[in-house]
Design a protein with these regions (language model features):
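Short alpha-helix immediately C-terminal to the canonical SAM-binding loop
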Residues: 15-16, 61, 88
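A short acidic, Gly/Pro-enriched loop at the edge of an enzyme's catalytic core
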Residues: 39-51
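A short SAM/SAH-binding and catalytic strip from SAM-dependent methyltransferases
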Residues: 50-63
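A short glycine-rich, Lys/Arg-flanked "PGG" loop and its adjoining helix->strand segment in the class I
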Residues: 62-77
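Core SAM-dependent methyltransferase catalytic element
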Residues: 101-120
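Conserved class I S-adenosyl-L-methionine
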Residues: 83-98
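Short strand-turn motif at the edge of the Rossmann-like AdoMet-binding core
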Residues: 56, 80-85
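Conserved SAM/SAH cofactor-binding pocket of Class I
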Residues: 1-40
């Protein structure tokens, strides 16, 4: 089964570089949706995802929790990174309110990443 991928970045240059990297790695662009807007994008809000990976800072991650809750499939995984170590407990508690449970935490040089799973 072919997978479809959605990439979102607010930086237009990052989206351009992603396209170039996809071509270099022989990934078909018709299987990939690229955009530089996640809030107003109707395409994203109509999809349901098996995996969401977000590498952004604490405040944007808090703002995205309701959207992630709507678009992720039950029993699917959410990976959050771009967090300072001391922010990890707060973001875990915040995402718990949206039905996400912590599975694993990784720490490296003052930064942390969390793997969470969406409850059914």
């Amino acid at each position: 089964k072919k997978s479809k991928i959605t990439f979102v970045d607010i930086d237009k240059d990052a989206v351009k570089l992603t396209k170039e990297n996809l071509k270099l790695n022989d990934i078909l662009l018709n299987q990939v949706y690229l955009t530089n807007s996640y809030h107003s994008n109707k395409y994203i809000k109509k999809q349901f995802y098996d995996l969401i990976f977000a590498n952004i800072l604490f405040n944007p991650l808090k703002k995205l929790a309701p959207l992630f809750n709507l678009i992720i499939k039950p029993n699917s995984f959410l990976i959050l990174s771009g967090l300072l170590n001391e922010q990890i407990p707060y973001i875990i508690n915040f995402y718990n309110k949206y039905g996400f449970k912590k599975k694993k935490i990784f720490y490296l040089n003052g930064w942390g990443s969390i793997i969470m799973k969406r409850n059914p």
